[in-house]
Amino acid sequence: MIKPVGVTIGDPAGVGPELIDRAFGLVKTGPVRLYGPRHVVEDIAARHPSVEPIGTSDDPIVIGQYSKASGVASVSALAKGAADLASGAIRSLMTGPISKLALADMDFPGQTEYVASVCGVSRFAMMLAGPTLKVTLATTHVAIKDLAGQLTENMVYDAGELTAQFLGSKKARIAVLGLNPHAGDGGRFGDEEAKIIEPAVLRLKAAGYDAVGPLPADTAFFRAVSGDFDAVVAMYHDQGLGPLKLVHFFDAVNITLGLPRIRVSPDHGPAFDLAGTGKANPKSTVEALKMASIG
């Protein structure tokens, strides 16, 4: 019997529940386990026969308003979904959008890092993927002031290798960006390119991967969307996600590379201001659910 797809509701006060509800009506998923507050998941499951509700909390929630209760509820759902992914009880996991405030007490900067930890994986990367542009981050949620001190050669190498493995070919064309303006301009604007990024690119090439770089970020994305590259490795969050969301604001998905099974999420937050208005766009949730269903 086919294992179910796991879906966490995200923050129940945000747009996650309504978008997931709509996506279930648009995607053939097979069996699904839906994790979240009991009254929320049971309500959604009543409209979708293939969905099994897994109640993980019971506190009342106010739609459109973040609260401690909604944050705790989102983490409870995530914890159960991640545990089932790690154990193999589900074949894949789609996580709904949560507020980073909810993870603060758990000492994890994002769902990516939390799920990887539960799965016992230390070598992982975050990819944001749309139909024409795919971007993997060498670092995830790191303050700009800390970047130069935290970026390592292994981070860059791992991001490149995991990207090629996800794309299914050593021949995948991977553009590796520089950290500094003009990729350092020969050391005028920093030495991270020479000390960290270029050695990682050379290692990728030596391992048989089609990687180039470090490239200036201001031109590499144009080349990527023009078809020169299959994916881009960016050094930090906004370097990669700014261009990605310009091209794929509504249809990109967030994929955790390096896990034993697929974990994917919509590429947006809980959007409390849109919750309950019917104005939130479901496309990213639909695309994420499609990928989870393939897994």
Question: Whereabouts are the PLM-identified features?
Answer:
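Ligand-binding beta-strand-loop-alpha-helix segment within the catalytic cores
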Residues: 128-158
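Contiguous, glycine/small-aliphatic-enriched amphipathic segments in soluble metabolic enzymes
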Residues: 1-112, 153-235, 239-254, 259-264, ...
